[in-house]
Design a protein with these regions (language model features):
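Intrinsically disordered, low-complexity terminal regulatory regions
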Residues: 1-144, 148-161, 174, 183-257
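Membrane-proximal, non-catalytic sensory/regulatory domains of signal-transducing membrane proteins
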Residues: 163-172
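Glycine-centered C-terminal helix-capping/turn motifs at helix ends
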Residues: 267-269
């Protein structure tokens, strides 16, 4: 994967107005207040859907979320099952951690169940709001901690951005998060990559960065699949050899044993 340029983008302007719109959306959806006839929708549809799932499951925004770690025996199973994911992601996580060092954001890698399997970046363990979401084995699924970029990326299967009060719980409204799902060489979701800041300036452009990094991790997972032949695909006019390539792993008998998402988009029948 190519190096990641240190990120110094300017924070998004209009922060207080945006937070006010989110606050009105919370009152309307989470507390049932009637929206005015001229009120413009302040939420992405998938955020409102997530909020309503949380409400339907008995969660309430004023309650304290359960930042629990999975039991030791279950964690051992997660570690064994996700060893390849952690190894494939580590080089990208390390480069990403350096690239976002000056942004007050840090990186979290989870498995497909939303359990933290690795982290990187400037992580202040003295801040409990940081510590509870960066412990290896922390369960950050929607069922446990409500609407977050982690749960949303895993459910929606697409890159997402959430800012402050777009998270479900009042206690998680300090976070701003970008997330992207990770797909393995079998085409199934293997986990997700998250960038989180606490009381940080809104940077929705981080969704693009996390998506690029997720692509690199997916390619590393595919390249790690045993193969006798690796086929690279790209469109006319594109140069082969970068992270946009479609990757096909083929065994000695000519059977395809794995493919990255780009290859599956180019060849839908895979």
């Amino acid at each position: 994967m190519a190096s990641i340029t240190p990120f110094h983008g300017a924070p998004t302007t209009g922060g207080q107005d945006r937070l006010a719109r989110i606050g009105r959306a919370r009152q309307a959806v989470l507390y049932g207040e009637t929206r005015g006839p001229d009120a413009a929708p302040a939420l992405e549809g998938w955020i409102e859907s997530s909020w309503r799932r949380c409400l339907a499951s008995g969660q309430r925004p004023e309650h304290a979320p359960s930042f629990d770690t999975v039991p030791a025996a279950e964690m051992r199973r997660h570690q064994e099952a996700n060893q390849q994911l952690v190894q494939a992601a580590k080089p990208t996580l390390e480069r990403l951690g350096r690239a976002i060092a000056d942004t007050r954001y840090f990186a979290i890698l989870t498995n497909q169940a939303g359990v933290v399997v690795d982290v990187n970046g400037r992580i202040d363990r003295s801040d409990s709001r940081v510590d509870v979401i960066t412990r290896i084995g922390a369960d950050l699924s929607e069922q446990r901690v409500g609407t977050t970029a982690i749960g949303a990326a895993l459910i929606e299967r697409q890159p997402v951005w959430l800012h402050r009060g777009e998270h479900f719980f009042d206690a998680t409204s300090v976070y701003s998060c970008a997330g992207a799902p990770l797909f393995g060489p079998d085409g199934h979701c293997a986990g997700m990559l998250d960038l989180t800041g606490i009381e940080a300036a809104e940077r929705p452009e981080l969704k693009h960065l996390v998506t690029q990094c997720a692509r690199g991790i997916e390619n590393a997972l595919t390249l790690g699949r045993p193969h006798a032949l690796l086929i690279r695909l790209n469109w006319p006019g594109r140069t082969l050899g970068d992270d946009t390539d479609g990757l096909l792993c083929v065994d000695a008998d000519g059977r395809i044993t794995g493919a990255n998402p780009a290859a599956r988009q180019m060849i839908p029948r895979l």
